[in-house]
C-alpha cells in the first residue's frame, strides 16, 4: 500500500489521536505531589478541586463600596476603627465578620449646604462631595476619638466617644469643628496625622498633621493645632506650621506617615526635589522632623516651626550607578521597636515600573540631621554643603526649652536652610526586597523571636495595586542580612490595597480596599501549605512528620526558614511507583500548578538508572520534555528508562517517582488503563507517519516546480526533453 493510499486512513486516525487530551495520552500524570491551597478571595471554596478549603482563617467585613481607607487599631479594646465614606465603623479585632454595618457605626454625613457648595465648584456629588474620614486618633487613653473628614471639600473634625456616640454639649471640646490643615479637602489626596499627648509646650495635647490647607492645593503644610488648656477653656499656644508657599520647605508633597519619637515628631513624604530643579524635574522621598516643644520664634517665624529640618531618604540598589526607588508610598514602625522604620518605594510611573522595600535605622536618621546643611547660593548655582563655620549656635533644629528665645541668626538660617546635605541611607546597602513591573502600595511588619534557637525573623506583608500580598521574610546569618519571598496571595483581585494593619494579640492581618475589609490569620500553615517543602520555610509554621501535616510552629516540629538543611524534608516526600508499557510516554510532575514564588527557581530532574547511575536530565524534544509547571515528560519509554526520577528545587527533594517498564509489548489488555496504554502507543506511531507524510508532501512540492511547462511533457518525467 502506497503512502498516498494510506493518507485517508492516517488522517482519520490522526484526527482521533489529536482529540485525546494530554492526560489520556499521558495517563500516568493524573496525580501530583503539590498544590497550593487558595488563600483569601471570596470564591476559593467553590473553585478548590483538591479538598475542602476551610475559610476560618479569612474573614470579611463589607457594607458596600464605601472607600475603606483609614484604620486605627486599639488592641486594648480589641477594636479596629475604620474610616470610610460618611462613616466610622467599629470592627471586632477577633472576628471582623461579627461586626454589624448598622449597629457598629457612626454616620458623619456632610450638611446639604456643604454638598451644594461642593457641587457648585465642579466636584462629583457621588464621590467628592461626601465626607471621607481620613484621620482617626485615640484621645484620653482611648476613651474618646479624634476624627477628621473631607466633608464635601470643606474639612471638618469631631471628637466622639470610643463607642461611636457623640459627646453631649456639656463636653464640648474647644478648637474642634474646623478641619482645615488637619485633613485634606480632596479624598484622593495623601495626608497624615498623629495625636500627641506628651512632650508638647505646657504638656498640652495636640494634633500634628501633614496635608493640603487650601481648596486649590496651593498650600501644603506640616501643622500643629492650637494648644488649649481644656480645663480653663483657654488658648495657651498658637498653631505652628511650615512656611507658606516656600518650595525650600515643601514642594507639592504627598504625605505617607507621621510618628512620635522622643523629643520629635517625624513626617515621611515625597515631593518635587528642589535641589534637582536645575537639572530637570524629579521626585525625592523625605523624612522631616520638628521638636514637640517648638513654639516658633519671637519676631521671625512667629507662627512657623523654628526647628523644622528635612533630609532625603535613599532606597536604591547599590552599584557604581545606583538604581533609585525615589517615591515613598507607605511607612510602618513596629510598636515594640522605635528604632526602625520600614517603607515601600516605587520608581516614577512615567518610566520603568518597579518597587522596593527598605528599612531605616533611627541612628542613620539622626546622623543625617546632625550632619551638614545644603544650600544654593544663587538660582543658577549648584546645591552644595554649608561650611560648619557658617552654621550659627545653638545648632539649628536642636530642641531647646523655649524656641522664642532663639537668636535671629538661627531663625534666619533655618528659614533658608531646612534641607540636610546627607541622605538617610537604608540598612544593609540594598533593599530588603525589590521587583520590577510591580507597584507596592502599603506594608505592615511582624517580628518573630524563637529564643531557644536565638533566631529572629522579620516578616513583611506588602500590598500591591492589584490586590495581592507579598509575604517576605528577613533574617540574619553570620551578621549578614538575608531575605526571600515566601508567598504571594490574592486578597482582592484587581483592587488596590489602600490600608493595612497587623495585630499581635489576634495574630491577624487586616486589609482595606475601596470595596471591603479582610482579616487573615498570620499562621495559615495547613490551610495554605500541603507539603513539607513550603511549610518549613514559613517562620509561623512547622512540619509534623508523624501526622504529615503543617501546623503552627512548636519546638518538636521541623522548620528551616533559612534553608540551611536541604534534606530536612526528604523523609516526608511522598514517593510514587508507576508501571508503564514499552513505547509509552509518561508525564511526571510535582505541582498541579507551580506557585508563583517558585517560578524563578531552578528545578532539576535526576534519573537513577541501573546502567548509568544518577545523572541530570537534559531536555530534548525527542526524549525529555519540560512542561510549563516544571514537570517532565519521558517520550517513548524503553527498558533503559526504568528507575527512580527525583525532582529537586535547589538542594531540596520535591518529589520522587519509581518507574518500572513492562517489556512485554503484546500483553493482552485486561483493564481500561491497558487499553489507554495501547491507544497511546498507536497515537505515537501515527505521529511518526504524520511526520513522514509531511516530509513526502514537501518533497512532492519541490518536484512539482521542476515540471516541464510544455503541454506534451509527461507528468512523471524527471528530465526535461530537449526541444525538437
UniProtKB/Swiss-Prot annotation:
Disulphide connectivity of cysteines: 118-129, 291-399, 315-358, 525-541, 535-550, 590-647
Expression across tissues is: Transiently expressed by a single large muscle during motoneuron outgrowth and synapse formation.
Description of the deletion phenotype: RNAi-mediated knockdown in the neurons of adult males, reduces survival to 77 percent. Adult survival begins to decrease from approximately day 9 post eclosion. Pan-neuronal or glutamatergic neuron-specific RNAi-mediated knockdown decreases adult climbing behavior. Glutamatergic neuron-specific RNAi-mediated knockdown also increases activity, at least during the light cycle and results in a significant loss of motor neurons in each thoracic cluster (T1, T2, T3).
Provide the protein's localization: Secreted
- Glycan attachment points: 95, 163, 190, 229, 314, 401, 563, 658, 670, 708
Q: Which CDD domains match?
A: Ig_Semaphorin_C, Sema_2A
- Could you tell me the superkingdom of the organism this chain comes from? Eukaryota
Q: Which residues form the Ig-like C2-type domain?
A: 552-663
What is any one GO biological process for this UniProt entry? axon guidance
Q: Which residues form the signal peptide?
A: 1-25
Q: Which Pfam families match?
A: Sema
Domain annotation Sema: ranges:
45-522
The alphabetical list of record keywords is:
Developmental protein, Differentiation, Disulfide bond, Glycoprotein, Immunoglobulin domain, Neurogenesis, Secreted, Signal
- What parts of the sequence cross the membrane? none
Subunit and interaction comment: Interacts with PlexB.
The Swiss-Prot or TrEMBL record describes its family as follows: Belongs to the semaphorin family.
By what name is this protein known? Semaphorin-2A
